[in-house]
Amino acid sequence: MKYFTLALTLLFLLLINPCKDMNFAWAESSEKVERASPQQAKYCYEQCNVNKVPFDQCYQMCSPLERS
């Protein structure tokens, strides 16, 4: 019973106070990711939509990044 209560408490805390990085679990460290193809960029924007990420953050993450 203790473990069940603990698990429910942890789940509740995760639901009400999600970690910022968890929203971008499908990306690398909440930073811009180099997108090699339009399909990858489309997938990135779709994931932003699913995770309800604001457009400006999504644009920063999904737009291609020139690496120097």
Swiss-Prot record:
Expressed by the venom gland. GO terms for cellular component: extracellular region; host cell cytoplasm. It is found in: Secreted; Host cytoplasm. Its main location: secreted. GO terms for molecular function: ion channel regulator activity; toxin activity. The keyword Disulfide bond applies. Residues 22-35 form a propeptide. It comes from the Eukaryota. The keyword Secreted applies. Transmembrane segments: none annotated. Keywords: Disulfide bond, Host cytoplasm, Ion channel impairing toxin, Pharmaceutical, Secreted, Signal, Toxin. Residues 1-21 form the signal peptide. Disulfide bonds join 44-62, 48-58. Monomer. Cell-penetrating peptide (CPP) with defensive purpose that induces pain by specifically activating mammalian sensory neuron TRPA1 channels. It non-covalently binds to the same region than other TRPA1 agonists (irritants), but acts via a distinct biochemical mechanism. Its binding stabilizes the TRPA1 open state and diminishes calcium-permeability. Consequently, it produces pain and pain hypersensitivity, but fails to trigger efferent release of neuropeptides (CGRP) and neurogenic inflammation typically produced by noxious electrophiles. Has the structural arrangement of two alpha-helices stabilized by disulfide bonds (CSalpha/alpha 2(S-S)). Belongs to the short scorpion toxin superfamily. Potassium channel inhibitor kappa-KTx family. Kappa-KTx 1 subfamily. Negative results: has no effect on Kv1.2/KCNA2, Kv2.1/KCNB1, Kv3.1/KCNC1, Kv4.3/KCND3, TRPM8, and TRPV1. This is Wasabi receptor toxin. The lineage of its organism: Eukaryota, Metazoa, Ecdysozoa, Arthropoda, Chelicerata.
